[in-house]
């Protein structure tokens, strides 16, 4: 796919690796898997990134629990909503932090439709808390808005490490996770 200015290209390999040339901007590595090969590739309308559509949802990580649960893979930058029968109700690209939370099994202990972080007036919606960091709870929520009213990252940047600890989702996907879970729902964190 050529950039709008005609001086760069995005190139996607059969395995989904994205290569950039010239003026094409690279916003993180996204790779396909044999269970979810690349089906389509498109440059965003603002020419600041790209989207890859896979032909199937990626499979669940090995050793990721049983029963109804949320699975968060930090290395894959992905969350799955898994039903009791093992079917997948949703899977979303996310942004977390490389070193937390630690791989383990947790339970959701609190949910808030709207919340403000304890510093810098950072606002979040659809907060679903499942563990604790050094000073604050860690959970799933939408892309936060800072004290100046600006989004702290773009949707195109989901799929890369951007957070100070929580797991960020697109607004509609954060709402879906919020509505799908309840206090006590299992959360399995894997690498």
Predicted regions and their residues:
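Intrinsically disordered, low-complexity
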Residues: 44-110, 114, 186-191
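Conserved hydrophobic/aromatic positions in well-ordered beta-strands
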Residues: 19, 80-82, 128
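Short, surface-exposed charged micro-motifs
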Residues: 8-10, 69-71, 127-129
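Exported/periplasmic cell-wall-interacting domains
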Residues: 54-65, 101-103, 112-191
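Short acidic-glycine loop/turn motifs at beta-strand connectors
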Residues: 14-15, 83-85, 132-133
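Trp/Gly-enriched beta-strand/coil motifs that build multi-repeat beta-propeller-like domains
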Residues: 1-55
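Short, surface-exposed beta-strand-loop junctions and turns on beta-sheet-rich folds
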Residues: 17, 24-28, 85-90, 146-147, ...
